[in-house]
């Protein structure tokens, strides 16, 4: 039987790495992150295949991914401590895997009362009363209330990181470049479809703006480790990957000494 997310709400603190599959994720030095919780998604689990890192969560929001990349999907299911999947995906799991699966569900469609504060504890929405396309853009504070999907799985992972309680969030591989291969895709291997260009300006970036408003108001920080990301640095500040990884390695050395 799958679970809800309530028992894990606020269970974490401090830093977390959100590992996506943009090509910049290939630059990560995993040894630097071995003491930092990791939330990974879709095919980005490939980065951890030859490491000892056990991700806290594996998030897969693409119901076709299991057919497109069955080996990577199976790896994510096995390696992660927890899974965040749609109900249809959970139905296809073994009883053992269902025991660590948490059910993704969509937040309620926007109604006028949502702009009047009735869901203040659960979510924040973009103020777009006159735009049908942007009306259901928001950021969930409670995974069991439901998530907002702006057409990139990294955004679901951000809502999960918030729900869990993390306050220092690092984005790796969130390049949002539809023309670039994912770091795990070879030149002749199968490629999963990508609709980033279609949704970047009308859903993805407006969603990240709502997310950043929530995080900033509550004193949480989000950093982008990708130098080639299409998310403007004014929206999510860049962090120098070498500096961040050097800090983690230095901290471990001091603690060991």
What does each model-found stretch correspond to?
Residues 1-257:
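Metal-ion/cofactor- or nucleotide/acyl-coenzyme-handling active-site neighborhoods
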């Amino acid at each position: 039987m799958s679970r809800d997310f309530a028992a894990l709400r606020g269970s974490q603190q401090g830093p977390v790495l959100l590992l996506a599959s943009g090509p910049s994720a290939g630059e990560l030095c995993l040894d630097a992150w071995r003491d930092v919780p990791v939330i990974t998604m879709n095919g980005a689990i490939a980065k951890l295949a030859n490491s000892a890192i056990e991700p806290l969560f594996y998030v897969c929001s693409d119901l076709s991914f299991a057919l497109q990349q069955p080996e990577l999907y199976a790896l994510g299911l096995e390696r992660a401590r927890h899974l965040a999947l749609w109900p249809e995906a959970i139905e296809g799991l073994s009883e053992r895997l269902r025991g660590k699966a948490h059910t993704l569900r969509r937040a309620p469609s926007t109604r006028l009362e949502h702009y009047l504060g009735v869901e203040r504890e659960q979510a924040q929405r973009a103020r777009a009363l006159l735009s049908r396309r942007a009306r259901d853009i928001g950021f969930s504070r409670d995974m069991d209330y439901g998530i907002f999907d702006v057409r990139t799985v990294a955004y679901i992972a951000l809502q999960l990181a918030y729900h869990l309680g993390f306050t220092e969030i690092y984005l790796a591989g969130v390049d949002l470049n539809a023309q670039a291969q994912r770091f795990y895709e070879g030149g002749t291997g199968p490629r999963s479809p990508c609709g980033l260009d279609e949704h970047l300006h009308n859903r993805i970036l407006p969603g990240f703006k709502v997310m950043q408003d929530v995080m900033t108001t509550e004193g949480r920080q989000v950093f982008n480790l990708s130098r080639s990301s299409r998310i403007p640095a004014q929206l999510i500040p860049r962090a120098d990957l070498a500096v961040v990884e050097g800090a983690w390695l230095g901290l471990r050395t001091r603690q060991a000494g």
